[in-house]
Amino acid sequence: LCDAFSAVAEGVKGKRAVEWNLVDAISPLSKWDDNVTEMSRRMADELPNRGDVKGIHMKTIERNETENGFAWEYVTLNFGPEERVAHLTLSLPSEVGATDAAAIEAQGCDWWIFRMFRELNLALLELRILQPEIGLVMTRVVGDVSVALGIDEVLESGAENWFIHEVSHFLKRMLKRYENTAKSFYAVMGEGTAFAGTFY
C-alpha cells in the first residue's frame, strides 16, 4: 500500500479504494444524499430496537469550592502548594452497590460509577479550560480494590441492558478524555489506593 501511494501520482481512487478496503463505499456526487440516507438507515436497522426505552433524567452536578480547589461527591481537585501542580482524587464507595440491571437503571444518573465519571469530566474540563497554568496532575484512586474490580463485573454482566451499555461507553469516552488532556498525569500509589480494573 505504501508503495502504491508513493508510486502512483493520482493515489488510489474509486473501485480500487473499495477493493483495498480503504473506504466502505463510493458514490457519485449526484447520488450522494440518497446513498448516505440509505446507508444510515441500513446501519440504524442493525442496531437493537430501543423504542420502549424511557431514558433517564439527568441532574445537574453541583460542586463545592474548598480552600484549595473543588470537591464533588466522589472526585476532588486540589491545587496544592507546589506551583503548577494539581491533585486529582477519585474516592470509591464502600461497596459495589446494586448489581441487578433493573435496580441500576432505576438509580439513573445517581448510579455511583456514572456520577463519578461525570464528576471526573467536570474536573478534566476545569483543568483543560480554566487551569492552563497547571502542568502536572497527581492522580489517586482511593478505596477498596474489590469495589474497583466488582464494578467491572457489573458492567460486563449487564452489558445487554441499554443503560449499562451506554454508561460503559461514557466511561470509555471519559478515559480517552483523560488520556488526551494536555497535562502530565502521574498515578500516586500507596496504602489505601485502588488502581484496578477500569481504574488501572
Report the location of each language-model feature.
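Amphipathic alpha-helical segments at domain termini/boundaries
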Residues: 1-108, 147-148, 197-200
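Alpha-helix capping and helix-loop boundary segments enriched in small/acidic/polar residues
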Residues: 4, 8-9, 27, 31, ...
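Glycine-rich beta-to-alpha active-site loop
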Residues: 5, 10-11, 142, 170-200
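Terminal presequence/propeptide segments associated with secretion/organelle targeting
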Residues: 92-94, 132-145
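Glycine- and acidic
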Residues: 100-110, 148-158, 182-190
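A short, well-ordered alpha-helical element
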Residues: 108-134
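Glycine- (often His-adjacent) and acidic-residue-rich active-site loop
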Residues: 140-171
